[in-house]
């Protein structure tokens, strides 16, 4: 992530005001800057149990002016989605300085270690499903 992504003060404030939110990342086409006007908004988060994802989607929808929002819990997400968020994502909010960097390092490190093993597993399953 060479250049900082510009986020509206309203988007940052929405994230700051979300109880229990520790990290919010924008990823997908809007983070890669290859979106079109109808593209959805892909957000990923890490939060404590105090965080209310449903309420947050409502808040963020009002902030970005769209109800086309995907919200991914990074504590429950698989290795590939965590890697893609780490690779392409932009930190909108982090409760503590360096939180996003630590997440990105851990996600990339895991994927680099596990990708070949996971790919072999996927290939084996697909081979069994193919008639």
Go through each PLM region and give its residues.
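Catalytic core of pol beta-like nucleotidyltransferases
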Residues: 1-23, 31-37, 47-131
